Amino acid sequence: MGPTADNTWQRCHRLGMSGPATVEREKIVIRTLVAPERHGDLIGLALADLDAGESLDAGGGLETAIVVLRGIVDVEANGEPLGTAGGRSSVFQGPGHSIYAPPGTALRLRARGSAELAIATAPAPAGAPAKARIIQPADQRIAEAGSGNWGRTVRTILGPEHAAGRLLLGETINPPGNWSSYPPHKHDREAPPQEVRLQEVYFFKVDPPGGFGIQMLYDDAGEKALIVRDGDVARIPSGYHPVVAAAGYSLYYLWVMAGDGRRMIPYFDPAHAWVAESRP
């Protein structure tokens, strides 16, 4: 059965192709990239562009993680100063700051200049951490994964080792022409210790921005390849999902995962697992 005839692949679409919903609130443009209610998903993702002096209110009843893609913001949690986050001019410049808030936290972020924020949300189980915090670059786990033309930089912002309720997220940078999420892996079934089920969303940026990458999605039922450009989003509810950057262009993606637990146990495609075993 081909990918377009299978429900799994009908759900794996690039929202940017049909245009994400956009609303304006107090001059701030907020783009809803992934709306959980449309698909019964756990993950919500939105993008906010702020000018100097503008404030964004976030948080509330959901667990929230905000990644400062560029710019600087002053952060309040429940009316109390939390600190300052940001400073990079581009996601390709290096690791940035993020803000984590458990359910019941009222966040306010005020931009010191032009700023771009990615806002990830998920319903949190009981026992989520009780305090909001700013995640510094030094708090992240930064690693060079893979080798050769499947080498990439992975910045784990909120991993299993970090206190949170349900959200897992980080950033990956593919050098020009390189693969990531490779060897191909998936996490769509609950079968520990081999695999645990996690939904996932990718948000892409490209440098220079006129370039592109390719997002593959496949399983036993079918396969497809999506051209992804700067600002695109891919939902990954199931299947293997490797990514490659076009020659001459660096590819960034913010990855957000959520499931019933916070373990990251991917299952590698047996047909390609030898690649990892044979690396220097």
Segments the model singles out, each with a brief description of its role:
Residues 9-57, 63-74, 274-278:
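Hydrophobic, proline/glycine-rich low-complexity stretches
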Residues 24-57, 148-200:
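A short glycine-rich, His/Asp/Glu-containing loop-to-beta-strand
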Residues 44-110:
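Extended, compositionally biased flexible segments
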Residues 60-83, 176-177, 188-232, 244:
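Glycine- and acidic-residue-biased ligand/ion/polar-headgroup-sensing regions
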Residues 92-112, 122, 227-248:
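Conserved metal-binding segment of the jelly-roll/cupin
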Residues 115-155, 216-218, 254-280:
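Double-stranded beta-helix
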Residues 198, 210-280:
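Acidic/histidine-enriched, beta-strand-rich ligand/metal-binding domains
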